[in-house]
Design a protein with these regions (language model features):
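Outer-membrane beta-barrel channel domains
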Residues: 1-170
Length: 170
C-alpha cells in the first residue's frame, strides 16, 4: 500500500478527532464513487468512509493494570493483510466495493508481548445517475460501511439524493 509522506503535527485539544487527508494511492483511486452527493448549502459532501483508519493505530489489548505501553508502541500502525477494491459502471449505475483486513496488532511491554485482533473493513456503494437531455441531473445512491472486530462490530448505512436543474440550481 506504499509508503507516503507523514502528516503535519496538529495539537487538538477539542472533543472531535482531527481528520487527515488520504495519501495512499490505492485508497485515492476511484474514491469519488464512495462520496455522497454534496450538500445544497455548498458544504462538503458526506461520507461514511474514512480510509485513514484502515491500517492505522490498532486497539490496545486488555492488560493487567500495572502494564504500561510506551508512546512508540501505542502509535505503531497495524499491518494490512490485504485489501481489495473495485469500482465501475454499468449503464446509469456506478458501483464501488472495498474490503480490507488488518493483521493482529502486537505490543510489547517489559519484555512481554501482547496482541490484539485486527479489524476487517467492508464498504459498498451503488449510485444511479440520470443526466437528462436538457442538462438536468438526478442521482440516487446507497452507501454501506461495516467494520468487524472481536470486541465490537459497527455498521453505518446511508441513502443520498441529488438533483440539479439545467440552470445549475438545486
Amino acid at each position: 500500500f506504499g509508503a507516503v509522506e507523514s502528516d503535519d503535527v496538529v495539537v487538538n485539544l477539542g472533543a472531535f478527532e482531527t481528520f487527515f487527508p488520504e495519501k495512499r494511492l490505492f485508497f485515492l483511486e476511484g474514491i469519488e464513487v464512495f462520496t455522497a452527493t454534496p450538500r445544497a448549502e455548498g458544504g462538503d459532501p458526506t461520507t461514511l468512509l474514512n480510509t485513514r483508519r484502515i491500517g492505522g493505530i490498532g486497539r490496545e489489548p486488555d492488560t493487567p493494570d500495572d502494564v504500561e505501553f510506551s508512546d512508540l508502541e501505542r502509535q505503531k500502525p497495524v499491518e494490512l493483510i490485504g485489501a481489495l477494491k473495485t469500482v465501475g459502471s454499468i449503464g446509469g449505475f456506478r458501483y464501488g466495493l472495498l474490503g480490507a483486513s488488518e493483521d493482529d496488532a502486537v505490543y510489547e511491554a517489559e519484555g512481554v508481548r501482547y496482541s490484539q485482533f485486527g479489524t476487517d473493513y467492508g464498504v459498498a456503494r451503488l449510485l444511479y445517475e440520470n443526466k437528462g437531455k436538457t442538462g438536468d441531473y438526478q442521482a440516487l445512491g446507497f452507501l454501506s460501511a461495516v467494520t468487524r472486530h472481536a470486541e465490537q462490530d459497527t455498521q453505518a448505512h446511508g441513502v443520498d439524493y441529488h438533483y440539479l436543474t439545467a440552470q445549475g440550481e438545486w
